[in-house]
Amino acid sequence: MKTFVAKPETVKRDWYVVDAEGKTLGRLATEIARRLRGKHKPEYTPHVDTGDYIVVINAEKVAVTGNKAQGKMYYSHTGFPGGIKSISFEKLIAKKPEMVIQKAVKGMLPRGPLGRAMFRKLKVYAGTEHNHIAQQPKQLDI
């Protein structure tokens, strides 16, 4: 018996829609990252993108525990000396709610070309409307 290795052209990808309203950010992000990688499938192969497409709605209503709303900081650097920027969770969720989920999931995916391909299958929307109805996404309860 030989070990099964998935081929990129034979991978069947499904579309799922996830409602983030009231869900804890970290618990939601780990399950999304797991499904983007394809680790929930029996034909998972580490060097092949076997994951599904995930559409996240209501990103603006995601929850964090404790006092992370004020205390959790997101940092970025401009590349210039002294160019470090920081923004708190509550300011980022008010300004760009999609970025909160995207940053959490991206940090859980592999670095490199394969991780970037997996990340492109994540679609995040602040409200309840999304434009992927033609793909007939299934509801995913997390």
From Swiss-Prot:
GO terms for biological process: negative regulation of translation; translation. The keyword Ribonucleoprotein applies. Keywords: Ribonucleoprotein, Ribosomal protein. The keyword Ribonucleoprotein applies. InterPro entries: Ribosomal_uL13, Ribosomal_uL13_bac-type, Ribosomal_uL13_CS, Ribosomal_uL13_sf. One of its GO terms (molecular function) is mRNA binding. This protein is one of the early assembly proteins of the 50S ribosomal subunit, although it is not seen to bind rRNA by itself. It is important during the early stages of 50S assembly. This is Large ribosomal subunit protein uL13. It comes from Idiomarina loihiensis (strain ATCC BAA-735 / DSM 15497 / L2-TR).
